[in-house]
Amino acid sequence: MAANFKEQSKKHFDLNGQSYTYYDLKAVEEQGITKVSKLPYSIRVLLESLLRQEDDFVITDDHIKALSQFGKDGNEGEVPFKPSRVILQDFTGVPAVVDLASLRKAMDDVGGDITKINPEVPVDLVIDHSVQVDSYANPEALERNMKLEFERNYERYQFLNWATKAFDNYNAVPPATGIVHQVNLEYLASVVHVRDVDGEKTAFPDTLVGTDSHTTMINGIGVLGWGVGGIEAEAGMLGQPSYFPIPEVIGVRLVNSLPQGATATDLALRVTQELRKKGVVGKFVEFFGPGVQHLPLADRATIANMAPEYGATCGFFPVDDESLKYMKLTGRSDEHIALVKEYLKQNHMFFDVEKEDPNYTDVIELDLSTVEASLSGPKRPQDLIFLSDMKSSFENSVTAPAGNQGHGLDKSEFDKKAEINFKDGSKATMKTGDIAIAAITSCTNTSNPYVMLGAGLVAKKAVEKGLKVPEYVKTSLAPGSKVVTGYLRGAGLQPYLDDLGFNLVGYGCTTCIGNSGPLLPEIEKAIADEDLLVTSVLSGNRNFEGRIHPLVKANYLASPQLVVAYALAGSVDIDLQNEPIGKGNDGEDVYLKDIWPSIKEVSDTVDSVVTPELFIEEYNNVYNNNELWNEIDVTDQPLYDFDPNSTYIQNPSFFQGLSKEPGTIVPLNGLRVMGKFGDSVTTDHISPAGAIGKDTPAGKYLQDHQVPIREFNSYGSRRGNHEVMVRGTFANIRIKNQLAPGTEGGFTTYWPTNEVMPIFDAAMKYKEDGTGLVVLAGNDYGMGSSRDWAAKGTNLLGVKTVIAQSYERIHRSNLVMMGVLPLEFKKGESADSLGLDGTEEISVNIDENVQPHDYVKVTAKKQDGDLVEFDAMVRFDSLVEMDYYRHGGILQMVLRNKLAQ
């Protein structure tokens, strides 16, 4: 029998007296299939993964041939991707680990072997999503916020700590250590692994998936990875591949270098705008060209981080000498760095700007010298605003029609003011456009010493000039690792940030994910009483409506330097390039240019204080560096003892009544429309992460279980309890359901009685009647975070199908993996164009004969008996997704497969 590709590609190389096995990409070239040098680097990484893991069952010669022919025959075929590791954060990680514990219990209930439910690849969970900014602008803020974090989340943390003892291959990085993507970049990523495989030291690329959409940040160092839903990550942990169609790869050719005044943040926002315009959803993006060598690795990581915002699966920078320089800077050993370089050169994956360019699906060019200081907002990251246009852009947005770029308000809004009487007797006035929150936050930027030290230098110059931040601005600094604190202190810049109120509040995601904490009660009252349009400026990656703070309606993304500058100005309704920020000690006007550091000032500071010793010291004891975490009392029993009275951790209902065999695909009849939504409905809208309102179904559930309102915590922190989460589905305070006109938030019309009621209440009534549900939506449905609860909650509400004009990648995949059918209107058609108003009964003519991307007949029966018929595409993107749907979900399939073994 002829050898398969795996056997043909197996080779060896020697380094420092050690022999290493590897799987040579040239094997496919030797078969005359392709020229490796013409394949994009990201495709080469996928190809190596297939060669090395070929088993003639899950991964076959056909998969390898199809991927090798990238660029020919329209990229037909699919990739069964088995990453080398998985990363989790605690909001998405808790439900993932709950599901593993639940799978174990289900396995035990039927007498199966519970040791089969164990991660088969290394899993690292970093606890970063739970810290909230309760205390700020004082030296004790870090300790106070950490203490509150542990009080609120003790049960969750006990559960995650238990898992480190119960499961193999699972580690947890404790709270107050850093943000998952920054810890991944600075410490966890090996770039090239060496593992013992059948007694041989085998070298291969580091690859991963993570339960957070910004997992993509790791592509900045040449490690291929992206965010997936928790469900897909769980399957990956249990040895299941992720299947996806062979991607298109858009090459972004970078030329020249960034000018004075422009930062990596400005470049990332510009890339986001350009690629959203281009349309790269579901595609890989790969950066190449002479401009790449002018970008420090930290800048590349900032750009790679924002791939979800530009819609790509990943934004990949192949490994080059700059990557190796960063590895040395962050304390990786010289021996390992030498191995990384040797392996990647041997296997044709080391980037050299002098080599011929690969063949990309399409190429766009970006001249770095044209990037200028910018912000994005007020409601989407792709809506770029040059700093020079910011004042006029904000003023136009106030009266522009309500939507992504407008608030739909009257000109009289500019006359509004709110008087604030502080408890200490001082007074302040807030007006339209004033800044309520200024936050240096998010791994997007805090991983980048150039922008962080740049912000410190802005603060230093501002303090020296005598500038102060207005009392109504809530300021905070939450870096993604302790290394940042080390270099800010080392440069002597932290005291200046402290003087402006940017004290350290925690190491975690904070404001970027909506954990901005409360404003002062007197400020909240003033804003609410006057219904004042106030703003936030943050160095985050998302600014969707309702995300940052319920009372802050306009949110702008900006570099840490601009966050400090706008905090000083106190308003976004200012032309920072031409109007003074304030008056200095000498009574003279101070302008932005007076406090802005030069490129040389910043790079000299970086060179002097960012050292390998800092990284080595901070990561030396990363899994045990928090005493509060170390003191948590846990058992080492392999089965979790679910407490029926817990409001944080419950055994989910996904496996209840599971049959031994999967069902068949059958038509969906008599569905009622629960929600009709427009474009750009985010996973934040579907499953919010932030505050739980006392009058919401989730709030009432918690009160019924004797949880006081002050201890509600957030939706994100309660993702281990399906009872809370199903009640929070479609409950974002800013979601607008067209079936409940005049309302905002999670309401719908229950058609049998025409009553407007909370979506959860209506869904439960439909469930009692045995009526399935449908959601109608516009373009980009499910954009934003890789939030698996957006799909899990949809399933538990009884939604059988979503019919949208288009989907964001991760959410579509999550719906299928939860047994919900994603359908797509024909191009040019929509719910509105077909005259669907949501009162109809919907039937979908689907059966066992369906294939991926087939069209099925959908019938909508009007109240007067008229029928509207249309075709919709079945968004199964691979054959295996049909299996997921048939089983009722991927976890059900995994459990059945494990039982069958």
Swiss-Prot record:
Q: Which pathway does the protein contribute to? A: Carbohydrate metabolism; tricarboxylic acid cycle; isocitrate from oxaloacetate: step 2/2; Organic acid metabolism; propanoate degradation
Cofactor note text: Binds 1 [4Fe-4S] cluster per subunit.
**Any GO molecular function:** 2-methylisocitrate dehydratase activity
Look up the domain of life of the source: Bacteria
Residues that hold [4Fe-4S] cluster according to the record: C443, C509, C512
A Pfam family in this protein? Aconitase_C
Family matches, as NCBIfam families:
aconitase_1, PRK09277.1, PRK12881.1
What does it do?
Involved in the catabolism of short chain fatty acids (SCFA) via the tricarboxylic acid (TCA)(acetyl degradation route) and probably the 2-methylcitrate cycle I (propionate degradation route). Catalyzes the reversible isomerization of citrate to isocitrate via cis-aconitate. Could catalyze the hydration of 2-methyl-cis-aconitate to yield (2R,3S)-2-methylisocitrate. The apo form of AcnA functions as a RNA-binding regulatory protein.
UniProt record similarity statement: Belongs to the aconitase/IPM isomerase family.
This chain's protein is named: Aconitate hydratase A
| Native source organism of the sequence | Staphylococcus aureus (strain MRSA252)
